Amino acid sequence: MNMTEKIQTYLNDPKIVSVNTVDAHSDHKYFESLEEFSEGEMKLRQSLNGKWKIHYAQNTNQVLKDFYKTEFDETDLNFINVPGHLELQGFGSPQYVNTQYPWDGKEFLRPPQVPQESNAVASYVKHFTLNDALKDKKVFISFQGVATSIFVWVNGNFVGYSEDSFTPSEFEISDYLVEGDNKLAVAVYRYSTASWLEDQDFWRLYGIFRDVYLYAIPKVHVQDLFVKGDYDYQTKAGQLDIDLKTVGDYEDKKIKYVLSDYEGIVTEGDASVNGDGELSVSLENLKIKPWSAESPKLYDLILHVLDDDQVVEVVPVKVGFRRFEIKDKLMLLNGKRIVFKGVNRHEFNARTGRCITEEDMLWDIKVMKQHNINAVRTSHYPNQTRWYELCDEYGLYVIDEANLETHGTWQKLGLCEPSWNIPASEPEWLPACLDRANNMFQRDKNHASVIIWSCGNESYAGKDIADMADYFRSVDNTRPVHYEGVAWCREFDYITDIESRMYAKPADIEEYLTTGKLVDLSSVSDKHFASGNLTNKPQKPYISCEYMHTMGNSGGGLQLYTDLEKYPEYQGGFIWDFIDQAIYKTLPNGSEFLSYGGDWHDRPSDYEFCGNGIVFADRTLTPKLQTVKHLYSNIKIAVDEKSVTIKNDNLFEDLSAYTFLARVYEDGRKVSESEYHFDVKPGEEATFPVNFVVEASNSEQIYEVACVLREATEWAPKGHEIVRGQYVVEKISTETPVKAPLNVVEGDFNIGIQGQNFSILLSRAQNTLVSAKYNGVEFIEKGPKLSFTRAYTDNDRGAGYPFEMAGWKVAGNYSKVTDTQIQIEDDSVKVTYVHELPGLSDVEVKVTYQVDYKGRIFVTANYDGKAGLPNFPEFGLEFAIGSQFTNLSYYGYGAEESYRDKLPGAYLGRYETSVEKTFAPYLMPQESGNHYGTREFTVSDDNHNGLKFTALNKAFEFSALRNSTEQIENARHQYELQESDATWIKVLAAQMGVGGDDTWGAPVHDEFLLSSADSYQLSFMIEPLN
């Protein structure tokens, strides 16, 4: 075959997954001497990262066929940074699709056919001179991550071919190197048969996106290493099994091993390599401390390869001793039932895509630890090696997932239709499946943090995936196997050791936990579960490998899931997902915005569905983390006026690392704080007396106990708050108008009330409050109007609420005042507007304004309830005040936005913020900034002029934003929210929850909805600050 024929053969044959690649192996480092090891830099590794030359072809017809030859003229080639995605450096355009394949509707294809019209080819060239340390040795090249398929040439010689975008592709190139300048040429094809296996829900970005480096090996080299640190939780002894394979001149060589930590050597010894270059050592009864996410204790294993007692290679490995097993249908870590407080995580950076840095990883892992997240699923591909090292070090449990997803071959528009799904049980796809399983296992097997192997994601089920599971079990008896897809094809239920589901509702999960009922989703939409077989009790431990679809303003009802921890077989879940996948794009005016699918004219696209993170794409925190942090905490605190009850859900650690701060607040103002140290053993609960320092008062009192770090850790400073508990002795204002003589002007069109430094106008024509002027400053820009609806959230749209509740939007915007009731007395003015709602017969809403001699405005809105109508999102008033009033303080539940189904983690207190900061910049603008249970709030300018709003008789909900509901609703991106000439205030009797079960049909749970059959009353007071 000529080169063109060879390329087409490799691209189009699913059985060919690699040519001339090095066998997958462990990711360990190695050094030629102890001195080099102590310095920490591998001299036998030479980075090729940096500027490369490139030619980009839109399809295979435009490719540079001879670019790899040494005599090729490279003058006209462009430049590109490696690692980095093509599309983010001007070569091609990003495309976001979820389930559908990127060519859907453009080319009609079925597996294993490969797109032709859009199969872009990037031809890379890099020149290098071999470092002296690598000369006269076997030399290899390693591509840590390339999407999708890669051909490699050195000095015009074809080296090899490889697939699997997310694990290393390595080739030996020793025979092709020359003295001086060497030419490396790499052709990266966007599509091959491998593309059918990489249909993950992410931006389709291609190119060389992870490190590229050369490496050489010593004359005898530990090529592969499997280290297993077992912990016997009954004897509390460790066992270390070392299995390694050497290559080169290994005859008569010894391996010296030293296991140690900062306290000294645990064990040491040596053993000889056998005739096949292999060695196996088992070291028992080791006095060690176990590894867990709570206490990620690591030991240093140093292997010395000895040649006549001379060190010729040093191999360091971090070892964590732990035993993860399924016993009596429970997953146990070191003998204790584990609960995953997990999150799914894509590798993502808003500027560089999946080409992320160690800085990104450190930020991610610290944020996870700071918010009580203890587990991560590498959705849906193996991550960079450094991530696993950090998880070992910082303490995170990892479900390591193979690079396999074929969602678009069997699920269409939410319906299961597997007529042409792959890999199924097709022999031609088995080599690729096993290759991907092997690549992941071999590289990641030595990481203590990896406790479960996952066969992939959303690829239905069949014998090919069953063979992957069998492979994992055959090579590793220390980790169970996970695969969710069997829920769609129960014939292959044996693939997974864990009952794993996606987006199962709390009631469905509870049904499994109490009856053992299995579901088979194959004949129904993925929104609902079909009936299954009763087994009376669960046969496997349960996790939700994906749940709480946190798209936009979401995360409501998380407590309904964490409440299931009372069932032993419920072992947690993994929120979808960690970070918004949004890419910075430049507007014509030079400013940047975070783009989503479709913004690059990418078609087909799944648009804003890429914004599901609990952190924003720019790595700032979303308000959703407030709830996650509280509910994921292993420390639970319940408070009353005299004591605190603390439950320690840690598996292994007591509370000696924490300080507890007991505080008392009166009307939200701290009046006392005392420090305590409580001793609660892991898994236990205890109640302690607390001497809350409090004086007799008519104020509302808050009794609070906060748990904070006693000392700084790697992931948080001293004093970092873990969680807190509160007990509130509620006292809401019952203020009433003060009766005193008023100056009232009863005009034909307006009722005017005037007093010292104030004037109020209530309009007969506009049927609302039109002016509130204090100290000569006008506050009302747009008078209050009824509000029954909000700027719909992603979850609202997914559940069909804009359609279902459309009548309420009309009702709020176009209500008609049918009666204006005016009561004027010498010391009192009260005006009531009676609203009739369009399309809703016999429904009235009364809004009353009463003004007293101090200029205070008492506002009441009443909705009496009407059976048979759709629910509404909210009930209250929306109006606008001057744009200069941007400073916001409130006494309510914060510090982030709060909703009735997102209250855990929102604590009652006084908070200072601004109108700008209280609006969360979700990828698509939507409802945001609500504060539940508010007693009062103020909005002011920089001169302390402003208004104070006080709840009467019952706390209200409110928001103060830069834009109106309508403006937010109409915007598709944050930059489309133009600078407003007003500050928009909403004061609400109630707002429904935001939901979070999923974003494609799940309603807000009934207990968090607002029934139109119920009555609602809003009552509050407006007064000037000065």
Curated annotation (Swiss-Prot):
Write out the GO biological process terms: lactose catabolic process
Listed as disulfide-bonded, the cysteine pairs are none
Q: Which reaction does it catalyse?
A: Hydrolysis of terminal non-reducing beta-D-galactose residues in beta-D-galactosides
Q: Which UniProt keywords apply?
A: Glycosidase, Hydrolase
Q: What class of enzyme is it?
A: hydrolase
**UniProt family annotation:** Belongs to the glycosyl hydrolase 2 family.
Q: What protein am I looking at?
A: Beta-galactosidase
**What organism does the record attribute this protein to?**
Streptococcus thermophilus
